[in-house]
Amino acid sequence: MENFQKVEKIGEGTYGVVYKAKNKLTGEVVALKKIRLDTETEGVPSTAIREISLLKELNHPNIVKLLDVIHTENKLYLVFEFLHQDLKKFMDASAVTGIPLPLIKSYLFQLLQGLAFCHSHRVLHRDLKPQNLLINAEGSIKLADFGLARAFGVPVRTYTHEVVTLWYRAPEILLGCKYYSTAVDIWSLGCIFAEMVTRRALFPGDSEIDQLFRIFRTLGTPDEVVWPGVTSMPDYKPSFPKWARQDFSKVVPPLDEDGRSLLSQMLHYDPNKRISAKAALAHPFFQDVTKPVPHLRL
């Protein structure tokens, strides 16, 4: 750790404080994540160390690079490449004018490329949200915190007792499914896609049941026809209200037909029928994709 000079605290992640820091030897600016684990007393579990070490092999232009893992006594520091801003802050700053559609399309395309790469290596994210999608001034967007959920679990609250958001959580997780797939990340990205377009969260639930009911009110309450097996999921209740599906043109009015088609496939109830990242990249919505540069206020 003595090789790093902390410059400033840049945030509080799910697992601990994040600092902007400088490598004293190379001058490289990095993001330093201090992982606070519940097992402070026993030190860091070896399983977590193994999981995290595997992530150093994930090299892709749309994945935030894990540069190093520093394990001291009972603390764990992860050294990542540094990016200037997250998508949440960028969306907040663009709330009045909105994000131009070509930039939304570029961001979604890049994020799907990053997802397709990780999914092909059997790595899930499980906790995608605008706060862990990082952008730079060149128009790139990258997925951060990939694989951390498997190494450390997804807590209900962060180390500062903030509630971990449910807004982007797939319905199969909310319904208690223990064995989920890469499809959970596609769902999260679909929610983020809609949020970039409409400038508001698609399903801003404040509890697990509120989250489910917001999804049901928009997409209709799922049944065995649209989602075989749903009624036998651990947290499914026959007493759930039966809502009808809303017309997608009213849910995301600014989107054209191709955009609505892609979004509806990303938000398919049945995880087995939900579009894969690889298939989504070939969707007609992306036939005119470019890479515009964002107007960042850094």
UniProtKB/Swiss-Prot annotation:
Transmembrane regions listed in the UniProt entry: none
Residues that bind ATP: 10-18, 33, 81-83, 86, 129-132, 145
Keyword set, alphabetical order: Acetylation, ATP-binding, Cell cycle, Cell division, Cytoplasm, Cytoskeleton, DNA damage, DNA repair, Endosome, Kinase, Magnesium, Meiosis, Metal-binding, Mitosis, Nucleotide-binding, Nucleus, Phosphoprotein, Serine/threonine-protein kinase, Transferase
Record bears the keyword Kinase: yes
InterPro entries per the UniProt record, alphabetical: CDK, Kinase-like_dom_sf, Prot_kinase_dom, Protein_kinase_ATP_BS, Ser/Thr_kinase_AS
Modified residues (N-acetylmethionine): M1
Cofactor comment text: Binds 2 Mg(2+) ions.
Protein name: Cyclin-dependent kinase 2
A Gene Ontology BP annotation from the UniProt entry: protein phosphorylation
UniProt xrefs under PANTHER family: CELL DIVISION PROTEIN KINASE, CYCLIN-DEPENDENT KINASE 2
Protein kinase domain boundaries: 4-286
Cofactor or coenzyme needed: Mg(2+)
Posttranslational mods: Phosphorylated at Thr-160 by CDK7 in a CAK complex. Phosphorylation at Thr-160 promotes kinase activity, whereas phosphorylation at Tyr-15 by WEE1 reduces slightly kinase activity. Phosphorylated on Thr-14 and Tyr-15 during S and G2 phases before being dephosphorylated by CDC25A. Nitrosylated after treatment with nitric oxide (DETA-NO).
Native source species: Cricetulus griseus
Gene this chain is encoded by: CDK2
